[in-house]
Amino acid sequence: MEYGTRKLSDVYEVSEILGRGGFSVVRKGTRKSNNDDEKSQSQSKSQSQSQVAIKTLRRLGTSNNLPRKKDGGENSTETMMKFPTMRQVSVSDALLTNEILVMRRIVENVSPHPNVIDLYDVYEDTNGVHLVLELCSGGELFDRIVAQDKYSETEASTVVHQIVAGLEAIHRANIIHRDLKPENCLFLDVGKDSSLKIMDFGLSSVEEFTDPVVGLFGSIDYVSPEALSQGKITTKSDMWSLGVILYILLSGYPPFIAQNNRQKQQMILNGNFSFYEKTWKGISQSAKNLISSLLTVDPAKRPSAQELLSDPWVKGEKAKDDQMDPEIVSRLQRFNARRKLRAAAIASVWSSTIFLRTKKLKSLVGSYDLKEDEIENLRMHFKKICADRDNATLCEFEEVLKAMKMPSLIPFAARIFDLFDNNRDGTVDMREILCGFSSLKNSKGEDALRLCFQMYDTDRSGCITKEEVASMLRALPYDCLPTDITEPGKLDEIFDLMDANSDGKVTFDEFKAAMQRDSSLQDVVLS
């Protein structure tokens, strides 16, 4: 793994977006076959590195943070990859720097490992820091499970064994994942015997070396009691998360279910869960004993990953091979659909500017009021001017404002653009800007909600995808957001009320109904 003066675009063809987070974007990359770098390598590159995932993190600091070899000079074409230290970046970049530091630890102490994502290379340019990662094209853990014709404890133990093997490797390197959940476990390929990889180390920490750089946010389903109470986080915290995953794999629902978020927090802190007879009567006692040991409130009493590698159930020796009750699979399918919707939303609202975005936009443009036909014209100009129909660069955004004859807004273009360039990739979703402007006109009520919804319903089908719901939530007026939305688990509580038929899409009526059932939103949005 090396870092040199080449540009990312010299080595890789970057294509479609695979996923987005609050601070990053992941795209598919294909290694070019005619670049000088490849010719200087060994006879041929492995197939696994020809197709990669490229994760772009916004730029760390104000200068090149990846120092070069002293003997290589400024014109060295290739040098060993170095990583920025915490001193080289501002505190605001700590989260992203943390991911790079943890990935360095993985490269040095874990890779290559069949159950941990591999980092091939790192590039840095004006757009940010690019991590060239192993491409996992086999889908998420739960997606694979619910698509199987046959599902039994044996299949569940097989995937759990792989997660345990990955955890054992990173724990041996003193790395705590801190965000273990189904969406962070991906299959390498679509093959039946594909290995399962643990990925996304953005929230991870190294014991006795780095401090966790973020607090709790979003879902608390997989969060350990010690994390919830802000106690000491250790590798045993990951084992609790594994226990939650295993419980869901064997039942189709999470172990801690409550009427509201506060009750759920208390249940987790007390370790209050049950094996309901109707669901669990067909599950082996070995599996239930394993779950009970993992979901023990005292971290010291939980088994380690190393200990679990020799557990008879994890090894498949005591896992039942009988096909599970179809109702369990059906519940797992419904749970998976809701989980993916929530995950998309939580990823989208992970930014320090999100909840103040519309408020800041109002302060920038003042009393400028867009009429409905102007908003529609703005949409048309975006589509006409922008090379990528949905995403606009700063230059394209300025061209749109000029075409719309909005000279008074042009001086603020860069600042408005920056409000919506959430992952710092140099582009913004034009629909978010449209929602922001429409929110200036209608800052509350059902009309504002419907306006934002229609901005994303581009095919006028009457429903939007889970990713679009997340983006819409991100662009809603500041006044439409409940004051406790950053409270751990609050988004879970809201999104549990959406997607009533679990089809992965949300209609306006479903979205509105969820708002009506949530008193904190109802008072503000629908009053």
From Swiss-Prot:
Entry's localization field: Membrane
Active site (UniProt): 179
Enzyme class, first EC level, given as a word: transferase
SUPFAM superfamilies according to UniProt: EF-hand, Protein kinase-like (PK-like)
Posttranslational modification: Autophosphorylation.
Coiled-coil residues: 358-379
Residue ranges, annotated region (Calmodulin-binding): 337-350
Regulation (activators, inhibitors): Activated by calcium. Autophosphorylation may play an important role in the regulation of the kinase activity.
PANTHER family: SERINE/THREONINE-PROTEIN KINASE
Family: Belongs to the protein kinase superfamily. CAMK Ser/Thr protein kinase family. CaMK subfamily.
UniProt name for this protein: Calcium and calcium/calmodulin-dependent serine/threonine-protein kinase
Organism: Pisum sativum (Garden pea)
